[in-house]
Amino acid sequence: MRNLISWLFPFLLTAFICTAVGQSAPSSCKQCAEWNRPQKPFRIFGNTYYVGPRGLSSVLITSDAGHILIDGALPESAPLIIANIRELGFRIEDVKIIVNSHVHSDHAGGIAELRRLSGARILASKWTAAVMRQGGVGRDDPQYGSITGIAPIKKKVEELHDGETFKIGATSITAHLTPGHTPGGTSWTWKSCEGDVCHDIVYADSLSPISAEGFRFTNSRTYPEVLDDFEKSYKFLETTPCEILITPHPGMSNLWDRLEARQRGTMPDPMVDGGACRELAVKARAQLHQRIEEEQKK
């Protein structure tokens, strides 16, 4: 009996900690409960897995030498992400690198706890790293003053550069600065293979022109380069090799429709779409043009 308790103790302790985190750090947003609905984890392709809640992506990229985790969703999402990783047969303790798309509480809120339990390195753009260290919301973020900020991440946050590649075992992931939604937005690319078949996967950061009341994309004093940044990010989506698209909010890339089609046996694999990134750029650019037109009417 004593041996059984000793064996179970680490698992029980992790469950207790995760439950406490989920209960003590609720996020104050209307959509949070809906976003944080449980989602059964699944293989996207090769060594790439979806481990997030239903409405907020978190992606695990595995290797024999350790794993990479993209995004941590909400603070209260950490227990679900950890449980999903375990359900797939992996361990949070084997995550070696955690990276982020953009530093809003619905995509970075769970990173501090995931890092604490894994001991992983946290890698982020210079702007994102600064916000992670100080907590809150960056003052030049278009949504500053209208959204809940993140708690400061007390452990070291390493700064990355545009085009920098990070490798664990046979797995490599490359950072691409795609600002606009925030000044530090970052997209990620890598290859995953099943046998001799390999696909270019893109985790494309959000590019929606959402802002706090009073922010103007056409003449922002706090983020004057925002329109140029959006255009650079659209060009990235239009030109980068992209066969499987994932987005921080899975619905933006029709992930659930594609998964359901795959489960019905649709062929070729609905997850694979060589035009998805370009289509996302078209939609995002149209959203910005609409926002600009609305601002010019005022």
Q: Model regions: which residues?
A:
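Conserved beta-strand hairpin/beta-sheet module of binuclear metal-dependent hydrolase folds
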Residues: 34-88, 92, 187-209
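Positively charged n-region of N-terminal signal peptides that target proteins for export
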Residues: 1-6
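Divalent metal-coordination and catalytic microenvironments
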Residues: 47, 61, 71, 102, ...
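Active-site HxH/HxHxD metal-binding segment of metal-dependent hydrolases
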Residues: 48, 76-79, 86-165, 265, ...
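C-terminal regulatory/interaction regions
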Residues: 271-298
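Metallo-beta-lactamase
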Residues: 24-30, 37-38, 43-45, 67, 74-76, 94, 156, 165-168, ...
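Bacterial N-terminal signal peptides
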Residues: 7-19
